[in-house]
């Protein structure tokens, strides 16, 4: 097995060849899109072969999140994965374009969620609903029309409930300012990224984006995989959230960046925020 909890210098297939079958709980990756003039987009990459290896190392009840294009998602389906849903990362700033560009300003990226057809029950997939909630919204209180408690009897279409003493009670649902997570993720792009988060990588993803995926779709102690470390954001998020990880990159510069982020993340302390904790 390769070294764990450290970004290592290998290509994707070399790392995957060293991993055992069904040894990974969650895969999150943002592979080269092969659509730009950036150096890492000039490599020859067989997505069908890559995703078949992902399917081999992923546990039957594990998630695979792909940050990429529709064409890449089709390759994932062709390799044997089943699509469950997708997130839209809605950016605060559009990607720049030239006068010859023949499409609108792009303000989003797609994040496809896949699972393995070998899974006997979809309900076995990890889904931490509370971890996906957002806080700081307006509080509210609404009357529950169908609430029942043990030993109590309903009346008036369920709006009032008769307790054991024969008194009618109204029951309410209270919300302390949270909203359930949805499929539109409004998170800053690199242009507006905090200076202490930004590293020297052209397509860096925000830590908040990875935190959502890791907290929502894995548990503490699980093992996460990313075969294209890039800016090292997955390695940092996994460390902060007490997940193990395997991660690699063929570029020595990005390997060093990732490991520096891991080292710094171990020194960060938690601070209280709405509904839980965030890292300072």
Language-model segments: which ranges?
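Short His-Asn-centered micro-motif
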Residues: 10, 58, 66-69, 187, ...
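Extreme N-terminal starter segment of soluble prokaryotic enzymes
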Residues: 3-7
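Class I S-adenosyl-L-methionine
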Residues: 19-21, 26-28, 38, 84-280
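Mobile active-site "lid"/loop adjacent to the S-adenosyl-L-methionine
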Residues: 31-49, 185
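Conserved SAM/SAH-binding loop
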Residues: 9-15, 276-278
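Conserved Class I SAM-dependent methyltransferase catalytic core
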Residues: 43-94, 114
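Short strand-turn motif at the edge of the Rossmann-like AdoMet-binding core
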Residues: 31-32, 68-71, 228
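Phosphate- and divalent-cation-binding pockets in alpha/beta enzyme and binding domains
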Residues: 15, 71-76, 237, 257
């Amino acid at each position: 097995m390769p070294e764990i909890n450290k970004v290592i210098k290998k290509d994707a297939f070399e790392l995957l060849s060293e991993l055992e079958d069904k040894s990974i709980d969650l895969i999150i990756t943002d592979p080269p899109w092969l659509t730009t003039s950036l150096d890492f987009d000039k490599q020859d990459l067989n997505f069908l072969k890559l995703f078949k290896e992902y399917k081999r190392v992923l546990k039957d009840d594990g998630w695979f999140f792909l940050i990429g294009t529709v064409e890449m998602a089709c390759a994932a389906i062709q390799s044997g994965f089943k699509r469950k849903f997708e997130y839209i990362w809605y950016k605060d700033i559009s990607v720049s374009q030239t006068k010859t560009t023949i499409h609108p300003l792009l303000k989003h990226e797609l994040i496809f969620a896949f699972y393995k057809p070998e899974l006997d029950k979809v309900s076995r997939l990890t889904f931490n609903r509370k971890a996906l909630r957002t806080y700081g919204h307006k509080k509210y209180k609404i009357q529950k029309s169908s609430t029942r408690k043990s030993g109590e009897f309903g009346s008036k279409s369920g709006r009032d409930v008769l307790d054991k003493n024969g008194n009618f009670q109204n029951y309410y649902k209270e919300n302390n300012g949270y909203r359930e997570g949805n499929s539109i993720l409004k998170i800053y792009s690199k242009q507006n990224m905090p200076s202490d988060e930004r590293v020297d990588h052209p397509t860096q993803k925000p830590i908040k984006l990875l935190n959502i995926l890791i907290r929502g779709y894995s548990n503490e102690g699980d093992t996460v995989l990313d075969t294209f470390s890039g800016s090292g954001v997955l390695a940092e998020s996994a460390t902060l959230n007490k997940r193990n990880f395997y991660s690699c990159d063929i570029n020595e510069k990005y390997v060093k960046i990732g490991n520096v982020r891991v080292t710094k993340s171990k020194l960060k302390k938690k601070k209280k925020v709405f509904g839980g904790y965030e890292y300072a």
